[in-house]
Amino acid sequence: MEKIQAEKSQSAIEFKNIVVDFGESIAIDNINLTVKKKELVTLLGPSGCGKTTSLSVIAGLIAPTSGQVLFNGYDVTKKPPQQRKLGLVFQNYALYPHMSVFENIVFPLYSDTSWREAIFEKNTWAQHDINCLILKANGATSEELAELNRLMQQRIDEPKRMAYQINDLMVSVFQKQSELEANLKLIPRKKQFAIISLSKETLSQIRDVETKAKAALETADSAEVEQTIKSELKQKLSEIKANYHDEKANIKAYWWEMLANIKTELKTEKTAIKQTNDYAKLKELKWKIHFEPLNLKKQYRSYFKQLKAKYSLKDGNLTESELSQIEELQKRIVSLKDFINRTAKEVAEKLEITKILHKRPANISGGQQQRVAIARAIVRRPKVLLMDEPLSNLDAKLRVQTRQWIRKFQQDLQITTVFVTHDQEEAMSISDTIVCMSTGKVQQIGSPSELYLKPANEFVATFLGSPEMNIVNATVKAGQLLWNENPLVKTKFDLPDGAIRVGFRYDEVTAPKNDGSPVFSGTLISVENLGKHMVGVVESNGVQLNVRLELSHQFEVGNAVKFTIKPNGLHFFDPQTTQRVEVKHV
């Protein structure tokens, strides 16, 4: 059944039109996203861009307002976190201080029912294989053994197949109902937000009117004028307050009407659902799944008893090779405790923490605590590993070492990983794919080099790279780029005449050479020594530019600096949309 599930989709995770609306703000705005299997994908962006909310939607900690979350092609939008087969690592490792490292690692296994079921399934298969070897040695035909295998496979796979069917039907049958229910829950928050916005706007109007009246009173030259101003102020305040109450009543009426409409639509939808064939099929499957596993188990046991009575399970006819096979199979049959201990030790070896299993979290370093948190997350062998800024609590040197280790560990285990960070250096060094986000929207998806070399818009261009990309307003005349009416570079480009935004990174700004390139001058307003070179900020033509300065020269704030810009490193953006414009040299 795992094979069937894996074949259903080549994607480990899919977002389909995901929206998370908190009422007063939209945290995720209609995101579509695909994470391939065995890939490390980083959600990158500034604080408040929606990356942690996106991770929480994947984890099942936040329910989307609309849209679908798919794991391996199956809809898990309504599934709780414990049913999603994933591991979580947060910025704060949340290790239990009163438990040893070993106890922290194994704790999730004792509380996971699906883990127990997996152990039972493995033990059952091992015992089945042993029985088949003995029955074959005692004369059972290949047809009889094939039938026994079929019944065993059916016993294991059929309940899973039914569960997947139920999941798919739940999605298709209740999709519209779920969206209506989500909108219904949002109405009180949206109504409250509208009233708060109205109150803020009204208070602002009152302040403006009072400020103007106060200024007028200060210049009033008679008691009569003062009285007129006060009278007008009183009237205006009365009008503003009356308007506030009217608008507030309108807001309440509007949202009450919306509430009533959605309730009516929801009632109609629920009635319509019950008339569909899919709903009838779903009811039948839900009833059947309670009894079918027991029936399949009985069928298997009944046939096995027939073969056992016919051929017996005595091992006298077994060859040395068959006895050896049975011995190996018996090793697979283990108790829950033994299996958990074995699994935890295997994970500890992979993460190189076997020597600290007996220690408490308080007695190990931050890097070791982070590895313990990862061990606890992967000990259940999740399909997906989610990491929310796991390196933020580490110092700079340990952060670099740990991110290198995480990358190697992820590649060795081939586990699909979603990594959240605001640190572009982390994202560039660790990722197969980067999802750059801003204001709840995906700005660009691609490899680290794609985002750096071909940013989709100005946000991506300035967010990736340190220091950030320089972007200036330029104009195009007959293919020539002009900055403040002067040529920016000597190269011409295939661009229509008009305004254009031009970007270039700090290392594309160099000292002048005798090659005919336009030379610009500016004033150095800051210098930062990075060891291998310096980064300066130069003010030129009213714009501050990041430039690279070589250590071979002495620079001080206030120095006049001359520079040229390399034409091959230019990026072009539309002034209206800020989107990238692909341009060729003439």
UniProtKB/Swiss-Prot annotation:
Annotated PROSITE patterns: ABC_TRANSPORTER_1, ABC_TRANSPORTER_2
Molecular functions (GO terms): ATP binding; ATP hydrolysis activity
Keyword Transport attributed: yes
Keywords noted in UniProt: ATP-binding, Nucleotide-binding, Transport
Residues holding ATP: G45, P46, S47, G48, C49, G50, K51, T52
Matches recorded under Pfam families: ABC_tran (PF00005)
Domain of life: Bacteria
Residue ranges of domain ABC transporter in the record: 13-464
CC terms in the record's Gene Ontology section: ATP-binding cassette (ABC) transporter complex, substrate-binding subunit-containing
Entry similarity comment: Belongs to the ABC transporter superfamily.
Descriptive protein name: Putative ABC transporter ATP-binding protein MG187 homolog
Organism lineage string: Bacteria, Bacillati, Mycoplasmatota, Mycoplasmoidales, Mycoplasmoidaceae
